[in-house]
Design a protein with these regions (language model features):
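Charged, compositionally biased non-catalytic regions
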Residues: 1-10
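N-terminal regulatory/effector-sensing and dimerization cores
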Residues: 10-11, 17-103
Length: 103
């Protein structure tokens, strides 16, 4: 994604996540398609919102909450990560997903 930087996008590129495609839509909006199958990802207080949609697989994707790890992944599942939100994800199997980044 050219000019505009999205912190979640940049963070995923420093992990095992593989970027399949991305585009900047303008006006503070970006879209990216990703694949991952084994990773532990900490996302820290981004200055934008992220809407995540699982496209395929994701059955072994775990989210860490205050009371432990929770599995909620699978095709057609949505997750909203609002601006300034911190989260930890443990990806233990194949996962194809898209992110919509917006300010």
């Amino acid at each position: 994604m050219s000019d505009e930087r999205f912190q979640v996008f940049d963070s995923l590129q420093r992990h095992n996540t593989r970027l399949r495609d991305s585009t900047r839509l303008g006006n503070g909006v970006g879209l990216a398609s990703w694949y991952n199958e084994q990773d532990l990802i900490d996302l820290e207080n981004a200055d934008h919102h992220t809407l995540s949609l699982y496209i395929a697989d994701g059955y072994q994707s775990y989210f860490k909450s205050t009371d432990g790890w929770h599995n909620g992944g699978g095709p057609d599942r949505l997750c909203l990560m609002p601006r300034q939100y911190a989260s930890t994800w443990n990806i233990r199997g194949p996962l194809s997903f898209v992110h919509l980044y917006f300010t």
